[in-house]
Amino acid sequence: MKIAVYSDKFSGTLTASEVIETIKELFEINSIKASYFPVTDGGEDSTIIFKEYGIAVKESLKVKDLVGTEKVVQLLDISGDVFFESSLLVGINNTDVDTMDLNTGCLSEIIKLPDVIGLGGSRTNDGGFGLLSKMGVNFYADKKLIEDPKP
């Protein structure tokens, strides 16, 4: 029998690679042979997983995240398509600031560069209104322009 083990991360506890290593150790103790593959759904930690499979970094950029902290993020070249993981800027682990005080506006600095944006693991819940606002879409409440829309 051939066994293939695929695992994504267990958010807040183990990365996909750590899950795989734990399973591998237990299988080896019990003389179980298998092949092991960390995987991702395109959300948080996608960049790490893709790079483990040899996906090349196309470009590294300095941009501000959802609380204004400058970060270095990477765009990957996946078979000619440029990939960006949005959680690098709006991720759950980027800040302890209340979610209701955050939005996706910081993604406007990078949105035009990738062909594919991995979603998931976001700390925001503004439905993209912050991003749309930065891209020129106006939102109003009681006929008053909302400058920095938040939930």
PLM region spans:
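N-terminal loops that bind phosphate or other acidic moieties
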Residues: M1-P151
